[in-house]
């Protein structure tokens, strides 16, 4: 099935937004621009009043126009006349002092300039210097609305699935393909030199220590603007060699750091005593657990062990296999004949399962090999099959095989 690109419902079309803002600014400029002096404007107002009175006295010949249209036209004309009269009265009003006039003109220009309103936040009325700053500022408001599993780009509005994807995507929008560390301000050019941290809350910038990272990118961090960084959906881009971020984490989580340092510096005797206490507590918990809790714990332990083995290196895997071989050798040396017989039966069943898996499709065999639950289900299914011989005959065969192996071992020694 082909995977088509889905439309993003959270994407904001900034071209349409800015086009609408420019149209509103143009209309505002046309309304405030009145040609001619005050006398010509008074004549225009008088003509509008004469036309209004003549239209009310005379009966119109056009019967197609409805009463609603006429009332709407007259209300628009009356509103325009009243607005122009108010502006003329404010223009003719005397001003007491020149300082008050200058201050009033400055405030009116700032409030009525449509170009400045193009970069004004529609939510908090904050004046931004450019469109890019306005877009980033607007997404500061929308970051709380975005769900925890979506990572919104503050430039184009694209929703990404992970913090790393957002960090790589943010490098595309920068002109020099660079970005800045949110803590120390150092610049980096590749996603291999920074971490994308998703924080539960926005960091308090007053608690950030003024420490610059020591590395090849610290020299480029001098030309960074002093504006506070933007946190889209709680994402921080932090460079790997950021000493300020490490120091900030130490100051924010002192209890965890002290606990780790105490574990690291504890003596050997104290460590052995602690491990013995933990083993005793674990054994007492397992003795008192129900069968359902035991099954859940075993499944959880198997899953954790599987995930740990998927992430281990070749050296760790070699050490683990060596430990398993040593433990198996010691266990077989101390087992009783009954336990040995049960182990041989289990090994025989495992071989039968393996031979059956070899006859299956390669894809299914790989799936069964990676899924422990599927392997357990197949083993449970195999238990329903009857063995080729009875239990008594199987026991006699196994005992004879054990005696034969013991004779071979004694002859070799």
Curated annotation (Swiss-Prot):
Where exactly are the zinc fingers annotated as C2H2-type? Answer: 117-141, 151-173
For region Disordered, the annotated ranges are: 26-83, 279-320
- Name the SUPFAM superfamilies for this protein: beta-beta-alpha zinc fingers
Keyword annotations: Coiled coil, DNA-binding, Metal-binding, Nucleus, Repeat, Transcription, Transcription regulation, Zinc, Zinc-finger
Which purpose does this protein serve, as stated in its record?
Answer: May be involved in transcriptional regulation.
State the similarity comment.
Answer: Belongs to the krueppel C2H2-type zinc-finger protein family.
**Cellular localisation:** Nucleus
Ranges of biased composition (kind: Acidic residues): 58-67
Q: Does the keyword Nucleotidyltransferase apply?
A: no
InterPro entries (UniProt xref): Znf_C2H2_sf, Znf_C2H2_type
One function term, GO molecular function aspect: sequence-specific double-stranded DNA binding
Q: Which residues form a coiled coil?
A: 260-367
**Protein name stated in the entry:** Zinc finger protein 821
The record's annotation in Gene3D superfamilies points to: Classic Zinc Finger (3.30.160.60)
GO cellular component, alphabetical, reads: nucleus
Q: What is the lineage of its organism?
A: Eukaryota, Metazoa, Chordata, Craniata, Vertebrata
């Amino acid at each position: 099935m082909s995977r088509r690109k889905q439309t993003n419902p959270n994407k904001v079309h900034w071209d349409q937004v800015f086009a609408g803002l420019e149209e509103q600014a143009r209309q505002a400029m046309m309304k405030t621009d009145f040609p001619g002096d005050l006398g010509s404007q008074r004549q225009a107002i008088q003509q509008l009043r004469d036309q209004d009175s003549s239209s009310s006295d005379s009966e119109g010949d056009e019967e197609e126009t409805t009463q609603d249209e006429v009332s709407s036209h007259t209300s628009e004309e009356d509103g325009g006349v009243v607005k122009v009269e108010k502006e003329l009265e404010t223009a003719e009003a005397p001003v007491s002092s020149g300082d008050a006039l200058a201050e009033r003109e400055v405030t009116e220009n700032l409030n009525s300039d449509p170009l400045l309103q193009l970069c004004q936040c529609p939510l908090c009325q904050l004046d931004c210097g450019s469109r890019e700053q306005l877009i980033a500022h607007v997404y500061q408001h929308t970051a709380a609305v975005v769900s925890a599993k979506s990572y919104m780009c503050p430039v184009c509005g694209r929703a990404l699935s992970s913090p790393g994807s957002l960090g790589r995507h943010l490098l595309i929008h920068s002109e020099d393909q660079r970005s800045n560390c949110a803590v120390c301000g150092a610049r980096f050019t590749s996603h291999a030199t920074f971490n994308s941290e998703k924080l539960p809350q926005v960091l308090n910038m007053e608690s950030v220590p003024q420490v610059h990272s020591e590395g090849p990118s610290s020299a480029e961090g001098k030309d960074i603007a002093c504006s506070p960084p933007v946190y889209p959906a709680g994402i921080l881009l932090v460079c790997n060699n950021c000493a300020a971020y490490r120091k900030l984490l130490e100051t924010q989580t002192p209890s965890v750091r002290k606990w780790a340092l105490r574990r690291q510096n504890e003596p050997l005797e104290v460590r052995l005593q602690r491990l013995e206490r933990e083993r005793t507590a674990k054994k007492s918990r397992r003795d008192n657990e129900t069968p359902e809790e035991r099954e859940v714990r075993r499944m959880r332990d198997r899953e954790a062990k599987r995930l740990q083995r998927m992430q281990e290196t070749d050296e760790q895997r070699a050490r683990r296999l060596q430990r398993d071989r040593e433990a198996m050798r010691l266990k077989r040396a101390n087992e009783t004949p009954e336990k040995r017989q049960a182990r041989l039966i289990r090994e025989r069943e495992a071989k039968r399962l393996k031979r059956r898996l070899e006859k299956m499709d390669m894809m299914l065999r790989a799936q069964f090999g990676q899924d422990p639950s599927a392997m357990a289900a197949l083993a449970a299914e195999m238990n329903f099959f009857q063995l080729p011989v009875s239990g008594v005959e199987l026991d006699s065969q196994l005992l004879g095989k054990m005696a034969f192996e013991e004779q071979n071992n004694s002859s070799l020694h």
